[in-house]
Structures are given as structure tokens and as C-alpha cells.
């Protein structure tokens, strides 16, 4: 372990601060708190798996929902599903037992899978953000389902290329019990540190910077468009009600409706971005400190800090389906349809009756309307 190696100074520091490094994890958090966190993490696993599975099922079963944006969202959901299944249960078990029961090789594999699926999820969120920027700011809607599939395939390959070196032993992966999960450990090797910096920049700092700039430009464009549409509507008078004036009025109304739809879609993506930032900023700082600061890595608070930041990073997998259910009406309807009949509180209203109750409802799913 990194805290037991390297130099006399590190050994002296370890004797003074962590007299039993291999068992330090068992003394950092009380047993009731560890068990509670593990139970909550298992619940997060179930909720994240079920919620993201619904997203994938909706896109798979309904051809009208296979637009470019929905394919991207389904890929994001799939990466969260794999993260929930491949990493979270083992972290929960380690939290309870304060021991890693799955071997050193699987420890390194689990750390690689963790970063791999996180990288893919971040890449998809970045692609969606750039697509929203091109549509709203540049007025270029170039992303079709075929191109989306190619971009998704490329993102999987790039994510594996970035996360893969940790599987081959490029950097130190620390086995619990110093942390509730196999994490990047302290190292003084320049190559290992360079890899960790590349990994953290690719996971958080670079996507965060690009998405932040994109959203600032989008907000500015939406604000200007809203002011222009409002001013044009206020300037109408009866003298403009000619044939040309009516056509211009119809175009303005279409712009207003399109602006409203794009603003709502952008708001949903913006909420996902905020959730990503809040969940991953602490983990990114923690990863850098673990590799560069021996005082932090060998300190008595490392286990508690690891538990908190890992728990927060997993929360993002649960956060996305909650946002979909809150913001997307079709997602809520699909959840109700997928529930077994015995668990449905309200009876399902047939489509013909829904048309009579709400005649204005348009049952058309084109590429734009089926997106979030």
C-alpha cells in the first residue's frame, strides 16, 4: 500500500497518524452509519437500474422515439445501468464488511469499469450539450439518428482508450479497506500522475468547461429570441392583417412555439448538467488529492471522505431518471404503462377516450417532438 512504502518520512508519518493503516477503514465510520449508507446505496442501485432501464425500453420499443437525442439519452441510461450493476453492489458490500472480498484482479477491473462507464456518460452529456448549442445558437440541426449512432460508437471506443490503461497496471489502484471501493492511490511516479490528471480532466474539467460555455451562449440566445418575439408580437396592428401580414404572423407564431419547445428541452439538459457538476466536482478534487497529496491519502479522514464522494458520484445515476420523470411527460406515461396492472393506482384511459377528453392532443412523434 502507498502509505506503507516509499520513504522513511512516509513511514514515520504513518506511525504517528495511522497506526493501523490496513484496518483504518474499520475505525473511520461507526457500524450503524456504514450499514445505513450501504442500504441507501443498494436502494440507489435498484432505483437507478429500474429508472434507466425504462429509458432504454422506451427507445427500443417505440420506433418514433428513436431520434438522435433519444438515442443519446438511451446510451446515457445504459452507461448508468452498467455502473449500477458492475460497481455499486460491491461498494455496498465493502461498506458493510470493511473488507474487499473479490480479489486484487477484480479490484483493478472494478476501478477500470467505474471510470469507463463514467467517462461514457460524461461524453454523451457533452455531445447532447454541443448538439443543443448547434441547434439553438448556430441554428444547425445536423445530428440525425445515423450520425448519432456513429458518434456513440466513437465515444465508447474513446472512453475505453482513456480508462483502459488502469486495467493494465499503469497507475496504482488501492485495495480497500482504506476506501470503500478500489480507488486511485498515492503515487510519486510522473507517468502515473500524468495519467490520473488526464483521466480527471477528461471526466470532469474539460467537459465542464465546454458545457458551461455552451450553456452560457444558449441562455444568451434564448433571452434575445424571447425579447425579439415579444417585441414583434406587440408591434402588430390591424393594418398588418393582409395576406402577407398573416403569413408573417403565422411564421412568428411557429417561431414562438419552436422557441418554447427548445427552451424546455434545453432546461432539462441544463438540470442534468447541474446534477453532473454537483456530483462530480468533489470526486474530481478528491481523486487529484489522493494521487498528489500523501498527507491527505494517509490521513485519518481519508476513508470518510472516500465514502462521501463515492456515494455522491453514484447519486448521478439515480438523479437522471428522476429528472426524466419530473420533466418529460412521455417518460411518466411510459412508466405507468410498464407497471404491472396490479400496481397501477389509476386505470389506464384508452387512447380513444383521451382524444375525446383532450381533442387538442396531437399524437404525432417526429424527431423534434420526441426529444426531451
UniProtKB/Swiss-Prot annotation:
SUPFAM superfamilies tied to this protein: Family A G protein-coupled receptor-like
Alphabetical list of CDD domains matching this protein: 7tmA_GPR45
Membrane-side (Cytoplasmic) residue stretches: 60-75, 131-149, 220-268, 327-372
Positions bearing carbohydrate: 4, 17, 20
GO annotation, biological process: G protein-coupled receptor signaling pathway
Coiled coil regions in record: none
GO molecular function: G protein-coupled receptor activity
Membrane topology of the entry: Multi-pass membrane protein
InterPro entries membership: GPC_Orphan_Receptors (IPR051880), GPCR_Rhodpsn (IPR000276), GPCR_Rhodpsn_7TM (IPR017452)
Compartment list: Cell membrane
Extracellular topological segments: 1-38, 97-109, 171-198, 290-305
Gene Ontology terms: cellular component: plasma membrane
Transmembrane segments: 39-59, 76-96, 110-130, 150-170, 199-219, 269-289, 306-326
Keywords: Cell membrane, G-protein coupled receptor, Glycoprotein, Membrane, Receptor, Transducer, Transmembrane, Transmembrane helix
Gene3D superfamilies: Rhodopsin 7-helix transmembrane proteins
Tissue: Expressed in brain; detected in the basal forebrain, frontal cortex, and caudate, but not in thalamus, hippocampus, or putamen.
Function: Orphan receptor. May play a role in brain function.
Similarity comment: family membership: Belongs to the G-protein coupled receptor 1 family.
Protein name, as recorded: Probable G-protein coupled receptor 45
Biological classification of the source: Eukaryota, Metazoa, Chordata, Craniata, Vertebrata
Gene (name only): GPR45
Amino acid at each position: 500500500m502507498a502509505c506503507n512504502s516509499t520513504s522513511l518520512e512516509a513511514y514515520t508519518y504513518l506511525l504517528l497518524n495511522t497506526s493501523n493503516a490496513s484496518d483504518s477503514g474499520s475505525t473511520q465510520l461507526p457500524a450503524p452509519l456504514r450499514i445505513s449508507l450501504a442500504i441507501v446505496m443498494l436502494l440507489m442501485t435498484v432505483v437507478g437500474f429500474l429508472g434507466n432501464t425504462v429509458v432504454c425500453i422506451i427507445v427500443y420499443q417505440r420506433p418514433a422515439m428513436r431520434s438522435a437525442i433519444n438515442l443519446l439519452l438511451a446510451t446515457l441510461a445504459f452507461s448508468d445501468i452498467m455502473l449500477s450493476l458492475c460497481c455499486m453492489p460491491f461498494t455496498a458490500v465493502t461498506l458493510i464488511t470493511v473488507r474487499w472480498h473479490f480479489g486484487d484482479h477484480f479490484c483493478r477491473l472494478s476501478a477500470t469499469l467505474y471510470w469507463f462507464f463514467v467517462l461514457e456518460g460524461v461524453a454523451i452529456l457533452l455531445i447532447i450539450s454541443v448538439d443543443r448549442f448547434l441547434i439553438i445558437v448556430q441554428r444547425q440541426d445536423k445530428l440525425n439518428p445515423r450520425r448519432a449512432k456513429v458518434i456513440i460508437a466513437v465515444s465508447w471506443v474513446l472512453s475505453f482508450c482513456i480508462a483502459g490503461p488502469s486495467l493494465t497496471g499503469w497507475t496504482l489502484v488501492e485495495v480497500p479497506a482504506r476506501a470503500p471501493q478500489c480507488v486511485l492511490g498515492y503515487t510519486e511516479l510522473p507517468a502515473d500522475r500524468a495519467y490520473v490528471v488526464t483521466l480527471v480532466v477528461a471526466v470532469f474539467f474539460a467537459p465542464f468547461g465546454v458545457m458551461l460555455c455552451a450553456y452560457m451562449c444558449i441562455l444568451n440566445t434564448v433571452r434575445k429570441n424571447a425579447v425579439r418575439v415579444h417585441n414583434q408580437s406587440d408591434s402588430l396592428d390591424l393594418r398588418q392583417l393582409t395576406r402577407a401580414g398573416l403569413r408573417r404572423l403565422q411564421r412568428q407564431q411557429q417561431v414562438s412555439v419552436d422557441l418554447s419547445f427548445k427552451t424546455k428541452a434545453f432546461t432539462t439538459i441544463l438540470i442534468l448538467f447541474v446534477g453532473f457538476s454537483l456530483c462530480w466536482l468533489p470526486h474530481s478534487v478528491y481523486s487529484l488529492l489522493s494521487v498528489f497529496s500523501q498527507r491527505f491519502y494517509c490521513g485519518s479522514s481519508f476513508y470518510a471522505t472516500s465514502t462521501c464522494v463515492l456515494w455522491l458520484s453514484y447519486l448521478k445515476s439515480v438523479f437522471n431518471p428522476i429528472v426524466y420523470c419530473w420533466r418529460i411527460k412521455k417518460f411518466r406515461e411510459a412508466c405507468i404503462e410498464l407497471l404491472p396492472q396490479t400496481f397501477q393506482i389509476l386505470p389506464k384511459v384508452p387512447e380513444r377516450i383521451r382524444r375525446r377528453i383532450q381533442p387538442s392532443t396531437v399524437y404525432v412523434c417526429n424527431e423534434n417532438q420526441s426529444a426531451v
